[in-house]
Amino acid sequence: GIPCGESCVWIPCLTSAIGCSCKSKVCYRN
C-alpha cells in the first residue's frame, strides 16, 4: 500500500526488485 514513486502505465515496475507491484497504474509496496 505504500507508493514507490513509479508508474507502470507503459513499463513494468523496476521497483519490483524491492517488493513493489503494479496496482492501478502505480507501483505500490504493501
Curated annotation (Swiss-Prot):
Domain of life, per lineage: Eukaryota
Database matches in InterPro entries: Cyclotide (IPR005535), Cyclotide_bracelet_CS (IPR012323), Cyclotide_sf (IPR036146)
Disulfide links within the chain: 4-20, 8-22, 13-27
UniProt entry tagged with the keyword Disulfide bond: yes
PTM comment: This is a cyclic peptide.
Keyword entries, A-Z: Disulfide bond, Knottin, Plant defense
Claim: Oxidoreductase is one of the keywords in the record: no
Tissue: Expressed in leaves, petals, petioles, and runners but not in roots (at protein level).
Location of cross-link Cyclopeptide (Gly-Asn): 1-30
GO biological process, one term: defense response
Family label: Belongs to the cyclotide family. Bracelet subfamily.
Function, as annotated: Probably participates in a plant defense mechanism.
Domain description: The presence of a 'disulfide through disulfide knot' structurally defines this protein as a knottin.
Protein name: Cycloviolacin-O3
Protein's organism: Viola odorata
